[in-house]
């Protein structure tokens, strides 16, 4: 369906607003993926707080202009599905990585995080970022471990001191 100028401007404005609030973006090629599978992907994306949209490449170039995702411009070739993660930087990458594992025709092209282009081969860097809760849990575990280790060393020193006396 052909879009008129107002329709194109509305799409650019809407998606640019999403891009401004996003932490990361992932670009993929969904040629050959069935509509049912794409519907599942979109549903999973909504649940994960990921905004997904298929947009014309010329409009995408305008959308990412002046954003940290400008580095993705060269990947806008062929059918392009773009996903913006607003809540967690790795959400879209994790979603696309899992979907690509089950759907051979789905191809992740690249991702962008904090203005840095991440090639498809290195998408794991973004997909494996811990969520806020996971990061806090790891930090607390490390702090607990350090405190417990200090206690053990103190008790061992006391034991050694008593044995020496």
Swiss-Prot record:
Signal peptide interval: none
GO cellular component: cytosolic large ribosomal subunit
CDD domains named among the record's database cross-references: Ribosomal_L10 (cd05797)
A GO term, aspect molecular function: large ribosomal subunit rRNA binding
Ribonucleoprotein keyword on record: yes
Amino-acid biosynthesis is among the record's keywords: no
Matching Pfam families: Ribosomal_L10
Organism domain of life: Bacteria
Assigned protein family: Belongs to the universal ribosomal protein uL10 family.
Subunit structure: Part of the ribosomal stalk of the 50S ribosomal subunit. The N-terminus interacts with L11 and the large rRNA to form the base of the stalk. The C-terminus forms an elongated spine to which L12 dimers bind in a sequential fashion forming a multimeric L10(L12)X complex.
Protein name in the entry: Large ribosomal subunit protein uL10
Gene, per the UniProt record: rplJ
């Amino acid at each position: 369906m052909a879009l008129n100028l107002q329709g194109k401007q509305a799409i650019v404005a809407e998606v640019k607003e999403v891009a401004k609030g996003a932490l990361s973006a992932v670009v993929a090629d969904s040629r050959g993926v069935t509509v049912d599978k794409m519907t599942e992907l979109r549903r999973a994306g909504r649940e994960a707080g990921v905004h997904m949209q298929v947009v014309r490449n010329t409009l995408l170039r305008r959308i990412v202009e002046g954003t940290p995702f400008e580095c993705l411009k060269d990947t806008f070739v062929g059918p392009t599905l773009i996903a913006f993660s607003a809540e967690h930087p790795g959400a879209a990458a994790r979603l696309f990585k899992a979907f690509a594992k089950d759907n051979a025709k789905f191809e992740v092209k690249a991702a962008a995080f904090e203005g840095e282009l991440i090639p498809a081969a290195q998408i794991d860097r973004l997909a494996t970022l811990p969520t806020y809760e996971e990061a806090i849990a790891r930090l607390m575990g490390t702090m607990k471990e350090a405190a417990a280790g200090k206690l053990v060393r103190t008790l061992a020193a006391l034991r050694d001191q008593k044995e020496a006396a």
